[in-house]
């Protein structure tokens, strides 16, 4: 379960058969990954039913086998613990996706982009200057969200708070870079809004925010594999609920870093200082 190779397991003691033969009661334990409280609760419930049916059939329900359930990472199956970190991410996604997408295209509409284009300002510096404000705003909004989640719901990260900010910095720059790419290619604010809205809906619905990725059809899992939101949700839930450190998140870190580099690089490359 800790290695994410199984969601529900049944732990049987070594001396199970010997204990039954000597008439001693045995303890069986079901361990369930309850990060998703609904999924963990259903899985442990189904397995408990199977085990109890077996005990009643083979042992006649004599009380020789006692079954206990251990809900890992979310002992009370609290759905808020599962959803609040994801909602913080969705808030960051909408904020740091929509606003950058409207940035450059709004300057195209009012004509101020022409004044910037005639300056000797480097493209990299220009895009960086566009990214930094949303990076700061995103971190401020994240901080407010973390405070509210602690005050209103009593939900605090089990892992490092600084690690959350570290991954948030990467994700904010990723989504802001993607928004600037759309802004570079859009002619009007309405066009940028509709295009960004389409991509954000795909990102949110195909990220595991509401439905576990492994329960999706193959084509949806393929889309989720190329979705930066998928990996940030995994990171937030692993830090919030499992208390994971950076050594447990190397895979997500590498993929998020790739997304950030690609989107930021394309944002710089796609910006043109001429209208040709």
Task: State what each model feature region is.
Residues 4, 97-119, 131, 276:
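Transmembrane helix boundary and interhelical loop/hinge segments in multi-pass membrane proteins
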Residues 101, 105-106, 152-157, 186-187, ...:
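Short helix-capping/hinge motifs at transmembrane helix termini and TM-loop junctions
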Residues 1-56:
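Extracytoplasmic loops/domains of multi-pass membrane proteins
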Residues 83-102:
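Long, hydrophobic alpha-helical segments
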Residues 269-276:
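Short cytosolic juxtamembrane segments of multi-pass membrane proteins
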Residues 73-77, 156, 208-262:
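Membrane-interfacial helix-loop-helix junctions in multi-pass membrane proteins
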Residues 123, 127-197, 201-204, 246-253, ...:
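Alpha-helical transmembrane segments and their short interhelical loops
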Residues 56-77:
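A cross-kingdom feature of multi-pass membrane systems that activates on extracytoplasmic/periplasmic
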């Amino acid at each position: 379960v800790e290695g994410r190779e199984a969601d529900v397991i049944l732990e049987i003691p070594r001396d199970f058969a010997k204990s039954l033969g000597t008439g001693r009661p045995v303890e069986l334990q079901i361990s369930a990954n309850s990060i998703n409280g609904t999924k963990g609760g259903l899985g442990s419930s189904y397995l408990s039913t199977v085990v109890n049916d077996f005990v009643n059939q083979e042992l006649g329900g004599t009380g020789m086998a006692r079954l206990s359930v251990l809900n890992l990472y979310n002992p009370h199956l609290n759905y808020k613990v599962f959803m609040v970190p994801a909602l913080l991410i969705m808030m960051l996604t909408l904020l740091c996706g929509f606003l950058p997408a409207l940035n450059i295209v709004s300057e195209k509409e009012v004509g101020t982009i022409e004044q910037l284009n005639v300056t000797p300002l480097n493209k990299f510096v220009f895009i960086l200057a566009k990214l930094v404000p949303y990076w700061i705003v995103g971190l401020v909004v994240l901080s407010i969200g973390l405070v509210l989640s602690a005050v209103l719901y009593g939900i605090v990260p089990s892992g490092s708070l600084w690690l959350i900010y570290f991954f948030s910095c990467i994700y904010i720059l990723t989504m802001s870079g993607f928004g600037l790419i759309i802004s570079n290619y859009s002619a009007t604010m309405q066009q940028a809004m509709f295009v960004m809205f389409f991509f954000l809906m795909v990102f949110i619905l195909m990220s595991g925010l509401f439905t576990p990725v492994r329960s999706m059809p193959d084509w949806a899992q393929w889309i989720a594999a190329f979705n930066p939101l998928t990996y940030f949700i995994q990171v937030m839930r692993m830090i919030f609920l499992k208390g994971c450190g950076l050594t447990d998140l190397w895979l997500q870190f590498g993929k998020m870093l790739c997304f950030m580099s690609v989107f930021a690089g394309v944002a710089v490359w796609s910006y043109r200082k001429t209208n040709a």
